[in-house]
């Protein structure tokens, strides 16, 4: 059985403006960790490394692009991201976003509320 895992993609259009897109990763039932019972999992996605990131409570940053293509997985707290087109999305604990807006005006990021945010960024190759 194929089960989709939802995530948000932040991408750049031909005019250089960033936008959000709702996407899914296919999870399939597989023997992921034998001899346990099967689990739902994606195929392995090659990664170049990861970093744990802490945003202080009430942190806010200027317009910036992601320095490289990366997955961002929210471990705790909430952030609001504003794309170049003005659309905002709030990411909460457990949410995932794929940042792919290099070389542009990028996006705004701010911590929502007065609690710190912990996230894990996973860098991926420039071309998948």
Predicted regions span which residues?
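A short glycine-rich, His/Asp/Glu-containing loop-to-beta-strand
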Residues: 14-63, 117-128
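Active-site scaffold segments
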Residues: 71-75, 98-100, 119-121
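A short beta-strand-loop-beta hairpin characteristic of the jelly-roll/cupin
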Residues: 65, 71-92
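Short beta-strand His + acidic residue motifs that chelate non-heme Fe in jelly-roll/DSBH
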Residues: 61-63, 81-82, 90, 99, ...
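A generic structural signal for short beta-strands and their flanking turns/coil linkers
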Residues: 46-51, 70, 75-77, 105
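Short acidic, Pro/Gly- and aromatic-enriched capping/linker segments at domain boundaries
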Residues: 1-12
């Amino acid at each position: 059985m194929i089960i989709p895992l939802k995530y948000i993609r932040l991408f750049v259009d031909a005019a250089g403006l960033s936008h959000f897109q709702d996407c899914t990763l296919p999870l399939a039932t597989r023997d992921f960790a034998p001899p346990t019972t099967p689990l739902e999992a994606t195929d392995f996605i090659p990664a170049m490394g990861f970093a744990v990131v802490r945003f202080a409570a009430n942190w806010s940053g200027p317009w910036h692009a992601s320095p490289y293509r990366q997955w961002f997985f929210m471990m705790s707290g909430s952030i609001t991201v504003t794309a170049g087109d003005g659309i905002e999305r709030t990411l909460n604990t457990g949410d995932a976003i794929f940042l792919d807006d290099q070389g542009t005006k990028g996006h705004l990021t701010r911590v929502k509320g007065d609690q710190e945010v912990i996230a894990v960024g996973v860098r991926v190759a420039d071309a998948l």
